[in-house]
């Protein structure tokens, strides 16, 4: 691959016209306009020795990534590699290891793909950390066998060329879920996925049984199932956060008494959304045709659509809706909060059908991607789409960053054999939308299907989908939800009322909507199960009267004062 230093710096430079109002903070991207200084700062990373193959050193693969973070008390408890930090964008640089023979790798502005540079212009106190990413079995750069350095404190002078040496002293171990008395960790080989990838592929889940499941004298023997799809970056280990509450005797009247299945939705490309694609393989079919039947053979589960519920937040929310619509004979009800775009005329702030670029709007201003609430009607834009894509490019220009846009491309774009990666939705330098790829994406536009498939999708949404989203969603996902809501309600006005709903909750953002959604969805799940004879009758007292979990008041939206680590991962249990 060609080096991408210049295109990425050009992307950052082009941000200047609209970035002044965004208070970009540490990056000071406007300095990218200054002429290159005479000094040349370098970072030297000692690479591990290569294994011998038939007497010769094996070729190197993967990327070396440098993460930078201002040495600031507000981020003292974070390591640079804990990013990207969406509320305090950080410089990132990376170098491909392809063709590298030396054991000492030089990283500077001339060799690296850089976001937030040039590196030569850094001044003052920073911390830098190196990561060697040679694994492609897990999302992101923390896969088994990958290595990292300790964070190194540096103090850059404006007029002195300096070198920093980093040693890769840490090794990431393969992820192992923690032992928990109320969780069973299950794995099952997928024949469909193994055939697609021509290697062994397993599907995984964390299982939480309800109170009474293992009691032979308990009156209920067969149980409904709630399938939980984690949000972006989440895994089946989300079960650990929820197990004690879900299996508690005291929660029986407030929490659906079901077997809760926490799925894994991560691939090397990012969140696959159980959406079949050339890149991710038949992940949806594997879930429905292999994994769910396996669970229903192994456990005492009611094998009927009305007994299978699916829920999720953010990317997990989009996935829950997708599964309910794609497999109506499997899932009988869906509960989704703050889903990824459900109407591509509002793909965050971009109309995929009419706009030319993801980076700029019709007025020429920068398109925002992530915001925070400042007041009743005021937001602060922390990150633009240009920022976000440039960050992903700096992590891996070949589409393997594991971040959000690369994950969307893996789900919805055609696979490009020449690139050995999904085809990008837009030009990484200009943001210009690739119309061929966009046409492929439209097959996954839920609102478009509501309008165009003769009422089938509209009926399913109206009958089976319960959707909540804050009006101040951090990623502007409320705009797509509002448009889908209008289209479904227009269909309902012509046809009939149904138990599903789409509601926008005033004042809540991407994170603060989750406790409200949890309370509301638990109540809705209980009502659904009772309506189908799958739950005990409602108690004579409400959760608020009994003090059971789920009765806690919903707090007003608040913002974390420190930088957010991967805000898209705020996938709370529903």
Locations of regions flagged by a protein language model:
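Positively charged n-region of N-terminal signal peptides that target proteins for export
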Residues: 1-5
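Non-catalytic cap/lid and distal C-terminal segments of serine-dependent acyl enzymes
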Residues: 69-559, 573-574
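Cationic, low-complexity basic patches in intrinsically disordered or flexible, solvent-exposed regions
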Residues: 566-570
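Contiguous beta-strand segments within globular domains
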Residues: 34-65, 204-206
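Boundary at the C-terminal end of the N-terminal hydrophobic targeting segment
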Residues: 21-25
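Bacterial N-terminal signal peptides
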Residues: 7-18
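Hydrophobic, helix-prone linear segments
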Residues: 26-30, 36
């Amino acid at each position: 691959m060609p080096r991408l230093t210049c295109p990425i710096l050009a992307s950052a430079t082009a941000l200047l016209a609209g970035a002044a109002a965004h208070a970009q903070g540490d990056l000071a991207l406007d300095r990218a306009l200054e002429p290159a200084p005479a000094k040349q700062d370098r970072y030297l990373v000692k690479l591990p020795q290569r294994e011998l193959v038939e007497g010769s050193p094996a070729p190197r693969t993967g990327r070396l990534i440098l993460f930078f973070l201002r040495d600031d008390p507000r981020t003292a408890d974070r390591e640079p590699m804990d990013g990207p930090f969406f509320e305090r964008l950080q410089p990132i640089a990376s170098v491909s290891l392809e063709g590298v023979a030396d054991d000492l790798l030089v990283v500077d502005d001339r060799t690296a793909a850089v976001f937030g540079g040039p590196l030569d212009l850094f001044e003052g106190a920073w911390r830098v950390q190196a990561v060697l990413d040679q694994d492609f079995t897990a999302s992101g750069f923390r896969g088994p066998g990958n290595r990292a350095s300790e964070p190194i404190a540096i103090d850059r002078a404006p007029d002195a060329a300096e070198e920093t040496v980093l040693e890769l002293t840490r090794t990431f171990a393969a992820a192992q879920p923690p032992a928990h008395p109320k969780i069973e960790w299950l794995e099952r080989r997928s024949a469909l996925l193994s055939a697609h990838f021509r290697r062994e592929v397993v599907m995984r889940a964390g299982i939480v049984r309800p109170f009474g499941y293992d009691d032979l004298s308990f009156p209920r023997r067969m149980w409904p199932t709630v399938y939980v799809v984690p949000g972006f970056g989440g895994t089946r280990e989300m079960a650990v956060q929820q197990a004690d509450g879900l299996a508690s005797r005291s929660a029986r009247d407030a929490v659906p008494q079901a077997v809760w299945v926490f799925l894994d939705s991560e691939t090397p490309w990012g969140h696959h959304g159980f959406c079949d694609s050339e890149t991710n393989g038949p992940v949806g079919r594997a879930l429905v045709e292999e994994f769910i039947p396996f669970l229903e053979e192994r456990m005492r589960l009611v094998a009927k659509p009305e007994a299978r519920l699916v829920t999720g937040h953010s990317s997990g929310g989009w996935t829950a809706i997708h599964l309910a619509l794609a497999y109506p004979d499997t899932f009988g009800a869906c509960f989704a909060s703050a889903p990824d775009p459900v109407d591509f005329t509002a793909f965050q702030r971009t109309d995929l059908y009419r706009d030319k670029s993801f980076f700029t709007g019709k007025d020429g201003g920068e398109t925002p991607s992530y915001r925070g609430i400042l007041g009743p009607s005021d937001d602060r834009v922390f990150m633009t789409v240009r920022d976000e894509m440039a960050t992903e490019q700096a992590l891996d220009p070949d589409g393997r960053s594991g971040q959000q846009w690369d994950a969307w491309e893996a789900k919805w774009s055609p696979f490009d054999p020449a690139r050995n990666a999904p085809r990008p939705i837009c030009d990484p330098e200009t943001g210009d939308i690739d119309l061929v790829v966009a046409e492929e994406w439209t097959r996954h536009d839920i609102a478009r299907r509501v309008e165009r498939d003769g009422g089938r999708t509209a009926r399913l949404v109206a009958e089976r989908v319960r959707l909540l989203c804050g009006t101040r969603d951090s990623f502007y996902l409320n705009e797509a939800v509002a448009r889908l809501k209008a289209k479904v309600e227009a269909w309902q006005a012509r046809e009939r009322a149904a138990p599903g709903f789409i509601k926008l909750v005033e004042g809540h953002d991407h994170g603060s909507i989750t406790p409200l959604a949890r309370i509301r969805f638990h109540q809705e799940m209980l009502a659904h199960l009772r309506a189908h004879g799958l739950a005990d009758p409602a108690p004579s007292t409400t959760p608020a009267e009994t003090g059971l979990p789920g009765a806690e008041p919903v707090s007003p939206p608040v913002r974390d004062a420190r930088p957010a680590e991967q805000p898209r991962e705020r996938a709370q249990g529903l």
